[in-house]
A protein has these predicted regions:
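Intrinsically disordered/low-complexity terminal segments and short unstructured peptides
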Residues: 2-3, 19-20, 62
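Flexible, surface-exposed loop/linker segments and immediately adjacent secondary-structure boundaries
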Residues: 24-60, 64-69, 73-227
Length: 227
């Protein structure tokens, strides 16, 4: 039998871009949620998140059907999840004064997302990596989207991972080869094949207009722990 315990947690007023010291400086927080967003830890514990909830290394963040979420990381990076998507924070580390400790390692498990890279992506590009079902994505300071159409089908498209770049560039690599993708270009990565350029697959990420508004610092975050 599954039980749910809800709690209200104080969320500190954090100056994310300032590289605040302490545990929160190496994580991120929920900026916006429309629908349902959960975070599952490695031990199986699941939390239902709300704006200002903290996210941590090891969390798998998942949106349900008809749900969107935006996560702000302490280095200034921003991740927007579309409905029915899962995204894991494999290892994130950032302290403004210690770039040698930078790390931004994540994985797209299902669905899709858009990411705007932050300070880790601009000053420590070799320490930024996003895993997908068919390749690993590295960046050169950028804004890009990634969609997994293997775990969940995308209407009218081949089963593959699709990537689109808005700004900057990325490099997608697997055991069969690699491909650089510049702004305005799109990529398809099928299982057992090298990454290659493709036409626009038409996979948009369109969060609610409310996501365009800044989130006020401080306040409270309401969370439910599902057991």
């Amino acid at each position: 039998m599954r039980t749910t315990r809800c709690m209200v947690a104080l969320a500190a007023a954090v100056a994310l871009a300032a590289g605040t010291t302490g545990a929160f400086a190496n994580t991120g927080s929920v900026a916006h949620v429309a629908g349902t967003l959960s975070a599952k830890k490695a031990d199986g514990t699941t939390r239902l998140l709300s704006p200002r909830s903290e996210v941590r290394t090891g969390d798998t963040l998942s949106t349900e059907r008809d749900s969107h979420a935006q996560i702000n990381f302490s280095d200034g990076a921003q991740v927007t999840l579309k409905p029915s998507s899962s995204f894991r924070i494999d290892n994130f580390g950032f302290t403004k004064e210690r770039p040698k400790e930078d790390s931004f390692l994540t994985s797209v498990l299902t669905g899709g997302l858009r990411i705007v890279t932050g300070l880790v992506g601009s000053r420590s590009r070799s320490k930024f990596s996003m895993g997908t079902a068919t390749a690993t994505i590295g960046i050169r300071g950028t804004t890009f989207s990634a969609h997994d159409c293997i775990a969940s089908a995308c209407a009218g498209l081949k089963p593959a991972v699709y990537v689109g770049v808005s700004n900057g560039s990325i490099v997608a690599q697997n055991e069969f080869g690699q491909q650089q993708v510049a702004a305005g270009q799109f990529l398809i990565i099928e299982k057992g094949q090298r990454p290659r350029l493709t036409d626009n697959p038409g996979l948009a990420i369109a969060p609610p207009q409310a996501f365009l508004k800044p989130t006020a610092a401080g306040g409270k975050a309401s969370e439910c722990i599902v057991r």
